[in-house]
């Protein structure tokens, strides 16, 4: 009877239409030209190049063509001046600099402020605070007093003084700070509880006169927000996802509409926590130049302007 009932249920509940291919137009579609009623706030990641080896992999160049500034180091005279000039030409509001308590990080920040003042550049600075140097683990998580105090001391002793500088970017008076990573590795899921860490950090910084605007950085794209713990998203004022690699053919073939659907899902899902979604875009590139064994699909050797415009339109939606 159970077997017959199961078969009968299948016979009633199934319809041949259920097995037809989905409507392609729902998933693969063109992105329309999109205009914003006001100017967007725009920032860009800055890579601090501290070694000539950064331009090589296994002794071979990891780029094609000729860099306009050559195989530079960020500390090379004239480099930062030109980069800030380009940033102003592009109307960037800020450059994002990673800070992981390394001396090279502090040197770059010092140089940035100095060059900005000397050249009357307009672009400002935002810190991306990397928790790696805190060496937290499931057994010694960041929310434990000792580790949390280390993080707070990083801010009170080094980063908060930057907020006093006109060169640091503030949104409506609130210093913007990225904190990475929001996506914790599967072996370290208990190493950070952001629902405890971020309020404690904000409280400490507010006692020094600043209301932080925190952005959690997810370094892995294509993952739906429901796959993360609530604290990894809801603890922040905003979140950004910065890796949209075309590591599958479908993601390459329908890249812009797939990203559009993904971002719409992010915005809808996290709105219940009053968390902003901050889109992250990038020019197309050929990853096989960086790694001959790369399996990522590429849009073209040199990138196409039309592709970048499409990506910008996705972000503006």
Task: Label each residue range with its predicted role.
Residues 15-18:
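Bacterial signal peptide processing site
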Residues 20-317:
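Glycan-processing catalytic domains of CAZymes
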Residues 1-4:
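Sec-dependent signal peptide recognition
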Residues 10-13:
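C-terminal motif of bacterial Sec signal peptides marking the signal peptidase cleavage site
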